[in-house]
């Protein structure tokens, strides 16, 4: 196991929050995955539910999202890649401060929704990464 310098943040990423990718026809993709792989979801895609270690008493299960986006989406910008990974994190505000100090490119401002806070960074190969601090319960 590689132990990277963590600047007093014990855990940076706690799990995979989601896989997002561009599709020519997102609706058709969701229908195909529902029909052939049993991934029945909603308008956004499918959510895998699971229990987070150490948080077995959480009111709601944790989730990992699978979601096709329209191929013309600008959500993944400034990345030119047809996909984006979402990672679950703890203490997003502090983590983004540390990442900025480390020279990591921060994209946009933190956004907050009923299901958590979101921030974005770029990796060295131009992949946009979404960081998600879920609200209690993991959803």
Predicted segments, located by residue:
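N-terminal beta-strand motif that seeds the catalytic metal site of vicinal oxygen chelate
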Residues: 2-30, 82-85, 135-139
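Core segments of cupin and vicinal oxygen chelate
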Residues: 10-14, 20-64
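Vicinal oxygen chelate
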Residues: 23-28, 78-128
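A short acidic/small-residue loop/turn micro-motif
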Residues: 44, 114, 135-138
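Active-site beta-strand termini and strand-to-loop segments that position acidic
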Residues: 50-53, 121-124, 134
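Conserved beta-strand in the GNAT
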Residues: 67, 130
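Acetyl-CoA-dependent GNAT
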Residues: 70-71, 108, 133-135
């Amino acid at each position: 196991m590689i132990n990277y310098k963590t600047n007093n943040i014990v855990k940076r990423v706690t799990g995979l929050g989601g896989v997002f990718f561009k599709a020519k026809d997102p609706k058709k993709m969701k229908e195909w995955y529902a029909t052939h792989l049993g991934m029945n979801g909603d308008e956004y895609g499918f959510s895998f539910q699971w229990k987070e270690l150490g948080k077995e008493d959480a009111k709601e299960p944790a989730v990992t999202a699978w979601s096709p986006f329209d191929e013309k989406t600008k959500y993944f910008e400034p990345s030119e890649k047809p996909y984006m990974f979402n990672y679950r994190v703890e203490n997003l505000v502090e983590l983004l401060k540390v990442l900025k100090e480390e020279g990591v490119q921060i994209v946009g401002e933190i956004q907050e929704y009923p299901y958590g806070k979101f921030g974005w960074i770029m990796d060295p190969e131009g992949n946009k990464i979404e960081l998600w601090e879920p609200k209690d319960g993991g959803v």
